[in-house]
Amino acid sequence: GTFTRYRTVCNHIREFLPHTYKREDIPLKELNLTFINDFEYFLRAEKKCRTNTVWGYMIVLKHIVSIARNNGRLPFNPFAGYINSPESVDRGYLTQTEIQTLMDAPMKNATHELVRDLFVFSVFTGLAYSDVKNLTTDRLQTFFDGNLWIITRRKKTNTESNIRLLDVPKRIIEKYKGLARNGHVFPVPSNGSCNKILKDIGRQCGFKVRLTYHVARHTNATTVLLSHGVPIE
C-alpha cells in the first residue's frame, strides 16, 4: 500500500543521487525543478517505470516536499512549473487482440495459469468472481440444441441467468475437471490472491487496462458478445 510506495520512492532516490549527481545526499534547499525533472527521467529511463507508475511516484515525492514546506524547512516549491499527468486507461475492457495475447501468454506457474484461465472464463461468460467461485457442476446442462449452458442465479442480483458456453470456456471447464471439491467446477483462489496475480499477468502482457473481474465482465459485454453475434440484452 501507501507505506510500500513511500519506501520504494526513497529507495529510488537513494539510487538516483549517486547515478545522476554522483553524491549520496542532497540538502533540501538544493531541490529545484531540474532535480524533479531529472528524477522523473531516471524513473523512466533507468527504472523502466511506466507513465502511471512514474506519476504515482512523483505524487509521493510531491507530498514529501509539501511536508518539508509546511514544517518551514523549504521556503519555496521545487514542483512549481512541473507538469505530469496519468495516462487515461479508463477504456475498462480488453480488445480481441488483447484477449488473444492473454490466452497465448506463457504463465510462470500453475497458479498463475489457473488465475488467467478463470479470468478468461469470466471474459467469455460475463460471470463475476463470486459466481465463478460458487459455480457447481449441477449448474452445467446440455439442452436440446446440443449446446452446454450454465443455469445459475447471480449472487449479486439473485436473478436467474442462462449462459451458452462457447468453445473457450468449455475447454477451460474440461481442463480443471475433477480438481475442485464439493461439486465445484473450479478450484478458485481467494479474491485477494487473484487480484494480485492478475496485476502481475497484466504487467507481463503489457496491458494498460488493469485486469479485474469488472473488466472481464465489461469485456464480455463489449468485445465477446458483439464478435459472436450475441445480442446484448
Indicate residue ranges for each PLM-predicted region:
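Conserved tyrosine-mediated DNA breakage-rejoining catalytic core shared by Y-recombinases
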Residues: 89, 98, 134-173
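Short, basic (Lys/Arg/His-rich) helix/loop patches that form interaction surfaces
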Residues: 108-109, 178-188, 196-233
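Hydrophobic (often cysteine-bearing) scaffold residues that line and stabilize catalytic clefts
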Residues: 2, 6-9, 32, 53, ...
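Short, charged phosphate-coordinating catalytic segments
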Residues: 66-77, 122-145, 232
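Basic, Lys/Arg- and aromatic-enriched nucleic-acid-binding interface segment
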Residues: 51, 55-59, 74, 78-129, ...
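C-terminal catalytic core of Y-nucleophile DNA break-rejoin enzymes
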Residues: 155-174, 180-200
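N-terminal DNA-binding recognition helix of tyrosine site-specific recombinases/integrases
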Residues: 9-19, 45-80, 130, 200
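Basic/aromatic-enriched alpha-helical hairpins
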Residues: 1-47
